[in-house]
Amino acid sequence: MQRERSMKRKRRRRGIKDMCNRHDCEIPPDLMIEILIRLPTKSFMRFKCVSKQWSPLISGRYFCNRLFTCVTRQQQQQPRLYMCLVAKDKQCVLLSSTSPDNTCFVLVDQDLSIPGYFFASVPGLLCFQFGTKACIYNPSTKQLLTLPSVKSDITAQQGQLKTTQYYIGRDPVNDQYKLVCTILIYSKLFANMSSEHWVFTLELGGSWKKVVPLGNYHPHAPATAGRSIDGVVHYLAWVDLYKCAVVSFNIRSEEVTTFLLPRKIWDVPVPALMMKADLIEYDGKLAIFSHSYLKDEGLVELWVLKDAAGKKKWSNMILVLQPCQRHLVHGIDLIVKGTTQDGKVILSPLEMRSQFYILCYDVQNNDLRKVEITGVPRLWLHKECNFDLKFMDESESFIYLEI
């Protein structure tokens, strides 16, 4: 009797499975995608476990692109602020929120709590560095991916230091995301420098591959965060204590180049540790935002790179803050945190305690605006910590991570 009941249950389960498979086959993949993209984004990771047919659909690049197009059309893109706080004891928290207006962000969501510090982003992904390893986080799907360490070919000798820096970029032609690793060995005052580069493609079976620099390459020490423009990651770097260069890594061709900045960009020789400048995107072009005189004189110098017929030329402009806005920067050491989607430069105080805020500088209209950040957990308000800030549109985070 018991054996007969067991056989009936097996036949019933087999019948249900066959029925589900028949129904799956009756639904075309295109129709399945149109159904899925109307469901909540945060549920996709659970839906991947429903059937073998759903998993590759949700993981596929076509689904991500289709979802992005659908959401962008249906809703107005709302910028989301991500704020990473790292205490001296290495405790790390990632907070985020949308803005109800243009004057305040209220941090309400704690997305992540891991050791590490985020340092770069592309639409849809945030990157953290944990020791010598890189972690990639998708805020929408809550996926966290840790990449293997790079097995460097260069070794620090006695008295030398070794640092590792990561950058992330996207190849818009092949729709590929890649992580770039710069490893530096140097002595005091940037003497005896040696650097190498590795690249990791974010795809199934990806691994670190060493990059062979081109002939005009200079060993260098990275000085700023990376800025990704049209499939190329750029950052400022020092080739010695007084010479600065722009380093460019083409995500598609995996070529790294360096070109020295002309002396005219700096009025006087500035040692590396005193430089107050960063790269930004200005009107679709790479630019240097120099704010050495901002806190004392309310003055910003902007150098825009124009590449005509293979020749790189710099044009510059000087911006002077409106008198009514000088108090926002007077006597305050600021640091550049990138740009918003509409081109505003994000500035934040070098140190923030008890009160968190950013400054949004509209370079086109020479207008500076203060945006407060509230809702930071009380235990962080008077704690000595490092922080970083990134803006990302909510409709950008539909990338499935897999290696």
UniProtKB/Swiss-Prot annotation:
Q: What is this protein called?
A: F-box protein At2g40925
Q: Which domain of life is it from?
A: Eukaryota
Name a Pfam family for this protein. Answer: FBA_3
Gene Ontology cellular-component annotations: chloroplast
InterPro entries membership:
F-box-assoc_dom_typ3 (IPR013187), F-box-assoc_interact_dom (IPR017451), F-box-like_dom_sf (IPR036047), F-box_dom (IPR001810)
**Domain F-box intervals:** 21-71
